[in-house]
Amino acid sequence: FFADRVVGENPDVDKFLMTNTHEGKYNEYPSLLFIDPFGYKGIKTKVLAEFLKNWGNEIFIFLNTKRIHAALENDKFEPLMMELFPIYYNEIKNDRKYKSTVAERLQLIIDNLGKEYQNILQNKVYYTAFKFQEEDIDATSHFILHLTKSSRGFDLIKTIYNDFANVGTVFDGVNTYTFDVKKITNPIADLFDMKALNIDKLKDMIYKAYRGKMLSAFDLFDEHQISGNYCRRHYAIALRKLCSENKLQSTFTDNKNHSVSVLISKDCILKFD
């Protein structure tokens, strides 16, 4: 039925995506949807939001942000951009003027897409982007954008992104998990250890937020990870560094010997100075 179709060419596809699959409180068919459009054509945000509304459903969208970036500058593509940004189209066109770099303008696209789903569903939507660099130049090629209503799904996808990213980045609101094939074919040592800088940034954030408190490492992670792109491994390393700096004390309650000072576990109790 769908083999020779793309979203937008057949109304039955939109109808399928907008179907409520719940029986009472439960979704009979929790599903994962991967959208790989031709650039940006066929991305109907309101339709996809109806799919995401069903419990357990999650979405990956493969985005050619370069083409979206260009289309936002050309009024001829306004109908397509209005399908992509049904609420924030005018806002994103205006806000782009105040972004000084291409990276900031591309991140504005990602952030506004996340806002679209959250506004339409009137519910918390977690979104995370994975960036692909061009093969032959130092520029962004595509993003994969993941959307979920589940904090657990948000946790899991960040772990997967971290496993595949090969570019050290600092999560500063512009940069995200990144893969650059050039680093495989022509590996060059980075001038700065961006991964270490990223951990130090998280470490300082955690200490500022939890100084003087006591809680399990799991509860800290569960509470704090929903606020940003850092994954479970980042938190474990950052907490161990705080422990080595004597800024927190770690105690295990499971009566087992552990080779590390902190694990993201309910059995690992943290007491911050």
What are these regions (language model features)?
Residues F1-F218, D222-D273:
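Class I S-adenosyl-L-methionine-dependent methyltransferase catalytic core
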